[in-house]
Amino acid sequence: MSASILLCDGFDVRRILTGKLNGDESSTVTTEEDDEAVFSGEEWCGESSYCFYFVKQFAYDDPEIKAKIDEADHEVYHCNTDRIHIANRLKSKRAARLSLVASMETLMSMKINEVEKEQEVVRGRIYRLGERLSEIKMEIELLDVQMACVLNQRDKAVERIKFLRMQRDKGNAAFYQSRVVMKKAIELAASGNVRDLEELADSEVEKFMSRWNNDKAFRDNYKKRILPSVNERKLRCDVQIRDLEGNLDTENGNETVVKKAIEYKRFSTEEESDDFDIPVYEKLGKEEKEIDEETLKEKKREEQLEKARLAMERKRKLHEKAAAKAVIRVKKEAEKKRKELDKRAKKKKAVCKSSSVDVDRTTETVSEASKPEKEKLLNGRSVFPKQRSYNYRYHGKGNDAVLKAIIKRRKAYRLWVWTVSSAAVALPLALLVVFYYVR
């Protein structure tokens, strides 16, 4: 079988040759690799060959879709690099956070002496570590937000690439279908089934011609697909071999080919108005719309990132304010505790001094009070002394125990006075009674 590409009546055609030798019933197939082989005339004299033509469909890579796929692929690459960079930063920040937490735990678990200087140093270190830890937490939260945005952007780009590839494959459905047909034709040619091969070729050509005659969009699409192969083989758009003596310039590319194609003859007088209508302005309009949509998407994404950044700044400021308030509160509480401790120490000192003075005073008053009572009893004065009015001084909360002791001692003194006076009265009465009965 020989698979060679020919151009006939404006269509890109693939020719399949198959044949049999007179002396051999098995089919023989020649391929493109065998074209360079040298055969003798005796081998080819008895061969009967058949030639079938199939319309070849080309795969068309739309430049717009290709540009979009390249752009999305570039965006995915940038997103992956940003993700790796953010992941490395997150790893370092988390390691720093763990080290700070460990150092704070060691400081908290230390057995601190009661010396105030050491406590102040440790508190200052804990405060500085807490500030650094809060800053690292804010940075980690910001990096997490950036990571989520990057991953979301990458996922959208991947979905866009999948959609564009599906769109490209959908546009090249005719190409994949023609590949299946050509594979089947090659198999039939290899097996020597000429009848089925002829039926297949006729049916495919009829299908193509019916669509060519009835569908203008199909004609335009096929012309667009065939242009690259025509330009590569230096053929005209009416599919005739270029005139070597002509003044046609092939250096200008597809634009010169499309412009000069209008000057040549059309395939038929009915299709003169349908040939090579290239909607340049429509393409430009579509491109502008797509560019506007892309710019809007980029603006929305930038706005979202800006909003996230502002929100993180607000949170950071609130955390800083809360940390400053907490520090001020801790300082005030520490000052209050220090003042209370100082007051308690002063009160203890005052209580100790006042208790010693009161004990001395009570001993002196008891000794002084016992002397005049004895003198009064000896002089025969009144047994019941006058009660003296004592002016008690107000003492603080720490002198309650001392006051109770003084009151108890005074009560004991009064009882002792009452017993002595009653005994002094009872003795003379008893003596009188005894003398009366004795007489």
From Swiss-Prot:
Compartments, as annotated in UniProt:
Cell membrane; Endoplasmic reticulum membrane
Mitochondrion listed as a keyword: no
**UniProt keyword terms in alphabetical order:** Cell membrane, Coiled coil, Endoplasmic reticulum, Membrane, Transmembrane, Transmembrane helix
Q: Which InterPro entries match?
A: PPI1-4
The way it spans or sits in the membrane comes to: Single-pass membrane protein
Keyword Isomerase in the entry? The reply is: no
SS bonds (residue pairs)? none
Instruction: Kindly list the residue ranges recorded as spanning the membrane.
Output: 415-435
Q: Which GO terms describe its biological process?
A: regulation of proton transport
| Gene Ontology CC: one annotated term | endoplasmic reticulum membrane
Coiled-coil residues are 286-354
Protein family membership: Belongs to the plant Proton pump-interactor protein family.
Free-text function comment from the UniProt entry: May regulate plasma membrane ATPase activity.
Which named protein is this? Proton pump-interactor 4
Species of provenance: Arabidopsis thaliana (Mouse-ear cress)
